[in-house]
Amino acid sequence: MSTASAASSSSSSSASEMIEAPSQVLNFEEIDYKEIEVEEVVGRGAFGVVCKAKWRAKDVAIKQIESESERKAFIVELRQLSRVNHPNIVKLYGACLNPVCLVMEYAEGGSLYNVLHGAEPLPYYTAAHAMSWCLQCSQGVAYLHSMQPKALIHRDLKPPNLLLVAGGTVLKICDFGTACDIQTHMTNNKGSAAWMAPEVFEGSNYSEKCDVFSWGIILWEVITRRKPFDEIGGPAFRIMWAVHNGTRPPLIKNLPKPIESLMTRCWSKDPSQRPSMEEIVKIMTHLMRYFPGADEPLQYPCQYSDEGQSNSATSTGSFMDIASTNTSNKSDTNMEQVPATNDTIKRLESKLLKNQAKQQSDSGRLSLGASRGSSVESLPPTSEGKRMSADMSEIEARIVATTAYTKPKRGHRKTASFGNILDVPEIVISGNGQPRRRSIQDLTVTGTEPGQVSSRSSSPSVRMITTSGPTSEKPARSLPWTPDDSTDTNGSDNSIPMAYLTLDHQLQPLAPCPNSKESMAVFEQHCKMAQEYMKVQTEIALLLQRKQELVAELDQDEKDQQNTSRLVQEHKKLLDENKSLSTYYQQCKKQLEVIRSQQQKRQGTS
């Protein structure tokens, strides 16, 4: 904070010059910093430190820059926030000029990332909450993409930049430090690798469709409650390389076909094949009819029982049938049902079964009983050995039930658009009696063609799974998503070098001239140097981490030595006291003997 104060303690005139760019007109309220009462630091954004504060008797979040290098990001966020006004975008109250900071709406629920993967205890949430969050995110981004005269690309959509308010029921987009006008078509790679569209880190010109790709990853993340590409690990360029080669998050067991189709379309390698954010809003709005309860506040567990729930973070009672989508290794291998480490989505309320049964009786098309596998009864927090999940399969059955007799609308739609989202396969529901944290899990869909399943060659958990259904001899589906057939994903030698893409924009090699051997040689040399640079930087990071560990161990050793020295001194002091007391005891004993002898002499003489 002292650095931020130093960086922003210049005169108000220089601060005004920094904010008032000649090519833009900013519409914001200038706030006197003396009116703000800072309470605590709550995190960081694309730039600067974010603090919770009081301003005019209400909670606000203030973002202060820490160095001169963050001024550009500050200008970008101030410019973009001053243009927007949407219920799903964080509100800008104004800005301070001395020190330079933004004053924004405060989100008491924290980020979506913390709700999904934060510290214990994690809240329970339903499929309705997950779908509602994605719908609200798409509505906010669609608003950005439709702005006039210049639309905006956020470029850094990810759960840490999505804030929750109103008990976790309302989502707001924040952190516009990397946003740009669509006309800008930036070519650097700001953002986060796990949610980043391939065209962004490949250095190509990109459009608003990069936000669509990020949205698709977020949809997968809120359904599975798992971090995307977490199994890859390592530096960011490892994830970039995998995404470039066609790897996508594994498909989800029992996920209804409409949601799966929308999600995989967003992952398309070709941006033109991805749906627009406006189309996503229409699809999600249509699907939300089958997910009631999104307006109910999130519930946090009051306590954990001693038997199996005290450490819910490691609970692996549920399984998701997922498949790797590394398209460079296609095979006929079915993936094992991988345990979900974050099983936290609560079951739908029991009233859904009543609504479903009523709709089925009205339509006359379906007759599905409330079996144990598809039960949606709410269980109390103290129940043990019960399965707590939101079975997406019954949601799909309700979609079929409510639309089987619906008159189709006029007009036509493109293939794989939401016009044919009701083409649903058979649902297989599995059961498990282990206690665990709740999630949308066990989403297995059957009835697809064999030979379409690929697996990551390094996966340690591969086994064959078959179905017992009498109507099909095909194996249970664990189908990965693959990009267009025309996409080169076999890792050939002509793949672009990816190491330099993780460098800062100014350090990346310029594109060579293909007709010049000298230019190509310089480019290849620069790429090799960039790869070596990244290797050295990684080693430095590991060594620094090891240094910190050794420093911590050294500090602990010093503390242990100090404790040992203190104990030795205390022991020596106690020995001295014992010796002194022993001497005093002997003296007292001698004095007692003298007194007794004197008394005996007196008695003898008397």
UniProtKB/Swiss-Prot annotation:
Subcellular location, record wording: Cytoplasm; Cell membrane
GO process annotations (BP): angiogenesis; anoikis; apoptotic signaling pathway; bone development; canonical NF-kappaB signal transduction; cellular response to angiotensin; cellular response to hypoxia; cellular response to transforming growth factor beta stimulus
Renumbered residue ranges of the record's region Interaction with MAPK8IP1: 1-300
Main EC class the enzyme belongs to: transferase
Activity regulation (UniProt): Activated by pro-inflammatory cytokines and in response to physical and chemical stresses, including osmotic stress, oxidative stress, arsenic and ultraviolet light irradiation. Activated by 'Lys-63'-linked polyubiquitination and by autophosphorylation. Association with TAB1/MAP3K7IP1 and TAB2/MAP3K7IP2 promotes activation through autophosphorylation, whereas PPM1B/PP2CB, PP2A and PPP6C dephosphorylation leads to inactivation. Ceramides are also able to activate MAP3K7/TAK1.
Assembly description: Can form homodimer. Binds both upstream activators and downstream substrates in multimolecular complexes. Interacts with TAB1/MAP3K7IP1, TAB2/MAP3K7IP2 and TAB3/MAP3K7IP3. Identified in the TRIKA2 complex composed of MAP3K7/TAK1, TAB1/MAP3K7IP1 and TAB2/MAP3K7IP2. Interacts with PPM1L and PPM1B/PP2CB. Interaction with PP2A and PPP6C leads to its repressed activity. Interacts with TRAF6 and TAB1/MAP3K7IP1; during IL-1 signaling. Interacts with TAOK1 and TAOK2; interaction with TAOK2 interferes with MAP3K7 interaction with IKKA, thus preventing NF-kappa-B activation.
Name this polypeptide is given: Mitogen-activated protein kinase kinase kinase 7
Lineage, highest ranks first: Eukaryota, Metazoa, Chordata, Craniata, Vertebrata
